Amino acid sequence: XGKTFPDVXP
């Protein structure tokens, strides 16, 4: 998803 909390993931 992304690189920042809470979207940590691909």
UniProtKB/Swiss-Prot annotation:
Alphabetical UniProt keywords: Cell wall, S-layer, Secreted
Primary location class: secreted
Known function: The S-layer is a paracrystalline mono-layered assembly of proteins which coat the surface of bacteria.
Cell compartment(s), UniProt: Secreted, Cell wall, S-layer
Signal sequence coordinates: none
Any one GO cellular component localisation term in the record: S-layer
Keyword RNA-binding: no
Domain of life from the UniProt record: Bacteria
Protein name: S-layer protein
